[in-house]
Amino acid sequence: MEFDEIKDALNALKRGESIIVVDDEDRENEGDLVAITQWMNDNTINFMAKEGRGLICAPISKDLALKFNLMPMVEHNTDGFGTNFTVSIDHATTSTGISAFDRMATARALINPESTPEDFHKPGHLFPLIAKENGVLERTGHTEAAVDLAKLTKAAPAGVICEIMNEDGTMAKGEQLEAFKHQHGLKMITIESLVNYQKDKDTSVELKAKVNMPTDHGAFEMYGFESSLTKEEIVVLAKGEPRVTENVRIHSACLTGDIFHSQRCDCGAQLESAMKYINEHGGMIIYLPQEGRGIGLINKLRAYELIEQGHDTVTANLALGFDEDLRDYHIAAQILNYFNVQQVNLLSNNPKKFEGLSEYGIKVADRTPIIVAENEHNHDYMNTKKIKMGHLI
């Protein structure tokens, strides 16, 4: 499909236009019409009802929901995607509440500073949805996309969305969405592109502590960071003053390898090799909580069970329902930005780390391989990393 740049979509929204926002194929894999409440024109909701044909909802921030005492529609939300519906509403000035103009009045009242909870009748014909506070960086839904887009256009944190259905009542996807885009002259973006746009703008790590850390491989400084998005704790082991081009090892936590010296992998040996290199040449190790390439400790142990039954490290993850590698390097890039590191000599054998850093604006100027000895227990694992995952070993 042909997608537009986020900046072009923002400009369209500020002109009062609707845009199409497409989510991931592993999620709903659908397109929603999205408009910003503050900027939408008088025909927006009528267009959504006539051409979109889906349920018209009003994504809002948590603060707006609290302001108007909009409580969850149900006590126990069993929606497959966790969509946070509140009780439906009509503005007191509307007639039946269902007309496009009544729903437009209700939506606009949600961003009126003078509106009060008493101005809304419940239930009604407009369905507010409460967005997660960290937007698409926390939940990749159309609800969060609409509120994030509103904020990016400097508008009140509220929007209007409607699923796009075909004339036969089926959901529009793929080529059907592209045809809809061209038929109506709309901009179309993906939630994935909005996530990346937000990550580029995000400063979500905060330094919490800094201490001296003597180790078997030299004396370092250890920095403790916290992600404001996930509340994860990240440590950085550093030697010397940060440089514009820095020696950097991005190491994914491996309890079994780093702590218990498991011979199933090469993680512990790579960490020790990196510490020796950084102690001699200066630089930093960013230690990310990405156990099992992002699937977590217990799932990694479950993957080991499958490996004992004949799977390799890639097919085991796939058999458990995960991608082969779930890691993202947004937080690593944020930490490098904190230290004003613009480019790196990356201590790694993994090309995906080069791509992951580049995606967030960090240039990989050079690479230093980390070569460690194989053993009888990790030979197949190392071979799979080389052949299936493209590791340069």
Curated annotation (Swiss-Prot):
Where is the region DHBP synthase?
1-200
Annotated GO biological process? riboflavin biosynthetic process
Q: What is its EC number?
A: 4.1.99.12, 3.5.4.25
Q: Which residues bind D-ribulose 5-phosphate?
A: R27, E28, D32, R139, T140, G141, H142, T143, E163
Tell me yes or no: is Disulfide bond among this UniProt entry's keywords.
Answer: no
Keywords assigned by UniProt?
A: GTP-binding, Hydrolase, Lyase, Magnesium, Manganese, Metal-binding, Multifunctional enzyme, Nucleotide-binding, Riboflavin biosynthesis, Zinc
Q: Which cofactor does it need?
A: Mg(2+); Mn(2+); Zn(2+)
Q: Relate the protein's function as given in its record.
A: Catalyzes the conversion of D-ribulose 5-phosphate to formate and 3,4-dihydroxy-2-butanone 4-phosphate.
* Gene Ontology molecular function, alphabetical: 3,4-dihydroxy-2-butanone-4-phosphate synthase activity; GTP binding; GTP cyclohydrolase II activity; magnesium ion binding; manganese ion binding; zinc ion binding
What sections of the sequence does the record tag as coiled-coil?
none
Name of this protein: Riboflavin biosynthesis protein RibBA
Q: Which sites bind Zn(2+)?
A: C254, C265, C267
Pathway(s) annotated for this protein in UniProt = Cofactor biosynthesis; riboflavin biosynthesis; 2-hydroxy-3-oxobutyl phosphate from D-ribulose 5-phosphate: step 1/1; Cofactor biosynthesis; riboflavin biosynthesis; 5-amino-6-(D-ribitylamino)uracil from GTP: step 1/4
**Reactions listed under catalytic activity:** D-ribulose 5-phosphate = (2S)-2-hydroxy-3-oxobutyl phosphate + formate + H(+); GTP + 4 H2O = 2,5-diamino-6-hydroxy-4-(5-phosphoribosylamino)-pyrimidine + formate + 2 phosphate + 3 H(+)
Where along the chain is the active site annotated? D325, R327
- Give the residues the record marks as binding GTP: R249, I250, H251, S252, A253, Q270, E291, G292, R293, T313, S348, K353
Could you say which residues bind Mg(2+) 2 here? E28, H142
Q: Which domain of life is it from?
A: Bacteria
What's the record's note on cofactor binding? Answer: Binds 2 divalent metal cations per subunit. Magnesium or manganese.
Residues that coordinate or bind Mg(2+) 1: E28
- Annotated region (GTP cyclohydrolase II) at 201-393
Instruction: Name the source organism.
Output: Staphylococcus haemolyticus (strain JCSC1435)
